[in-house]
Curated annotation (Swiss-Prot):
This is PKHD-type hydroxylase Nham_3637. SMART domains: P4Hc. Keywords: Dioxygenase, Iron, Metal-binding, Oxidoreductase, Vitamin C. InterPro entries: Oxoglu/Fe-dep_dioxygenase_dom, PKHD_C, PKHD_hydroxylase, Pro_4_hyd_alph, Pro_4_hyd_alph_FE2OG_OXY. Its cofactor is Fe(2+); L-ascorbate. It holds the Pfam family 2OG-FeII_Oxy_3. GO terms for biological process: DNA damage response; intracellular iron ion homeostasis. Residues 78-180 form the Fe2OG dioxygenase domain. One of its GO terms (molecular function) is L-ascorbic acid binding.
């Protein structure tokens, strides 16, 4: 299930991120890659744990917690602290086909996060760079994603995906993983579809008795399937 989440960050927040990044040193992105991913990863990354990375990560987390579409699509239990990467044309940067590690350990805590859902939050406008598409593969084929700054795509962590070579400009983004309360992707998609249907029904027929019964069904399913 791929879900586009628009306007996660405001233009002002995106601009603030870019200003902070402009005065921060970047490191080789392979520092956070697993063995398989490191062989195909060619990009730069903000160092984890720096004041700048923590400030921007906290901004993203606060925005996610205020976003009902993200909560509905992902049903977040634990969000890995957001990371930030950059792909430059002059370095012929790209990220070959790979699958994200199933488990990520939060640095300095020992906390392990199961990567049920992967997310990419775009911080560069499409007009700023050529190439750099995020290509996600599923049973229906390959989906190429290149969104406006401030918009985000979420997709199953089990997906094979890659980032094409940037041939002009720079592509800047935040990326992170979420452990969902519902680990099964099919059940999670069903819950999202049910929630969206309830919202549409309530908007069209707010007094319809099915709104209450379907809402009850949603929460009872969540009780059955959610992992504490």
């Amino acid at each position: 299930m791929l879900v586009r989440i628009p306007n996660v960050l405001t233009p002002e927040q995106v601009q603030h991120c870019r200003e902070v990044m402009a005065r921060t040193a970047w490191v080789d992105g392979r520092v956070t890659a697993g063995h398989q991913s490191a062989q195909v990863k060619r990009n730069l990354q903000l160092p984890e744990g720096t004041p700048e990375a923590r400030e921007l990560g906290d901004m993203v987390l606060a925005a996610l917690n205020r976003n009902p579409l993200f909560v509905s699509a992902v049903l977040p239990k634990t969000i890995f602290p957001p990371l930030f990467n950059r792909y430059d044309a002059d370095g012929e940067m790209n990220f070959g086909s790979h699958v994200d590690n199933a488990i990520r350990t939060v640095p300095g805590t020992g906390m392990r996060v199961r990567t049920d859902v992967s997310s990419t939050l775009f911080l560069s406008s499409p007009e700023e760079y050529d190439g750099g598409e995020l290509v996600i593969e599923d049973t229906y084929g390959a989906h190429s994603v290149k969104l406006p700054a401030g918009d985000m795509i979420v997709y199953p962590g089990t997906s094979v995906h890659h980032v094409t070579k940037v041939t002009r400009g720079s592509r800047i983004a935040s990326f992170f993983w979420t452990e969902s309360m519902i680990s099964d992707v099919i059940r999670r998609a069903m819950m999202f579809d049910l929630d969206m249907s309830i919202i549409r029904l309530n908007a069209d027929h707010p007094e319809h008795p099915s709104v209450v019964s379907l809402t009850s069904l949603y929460h009872n399913l969540l009780r059955q399937w959610a992992q504490s």
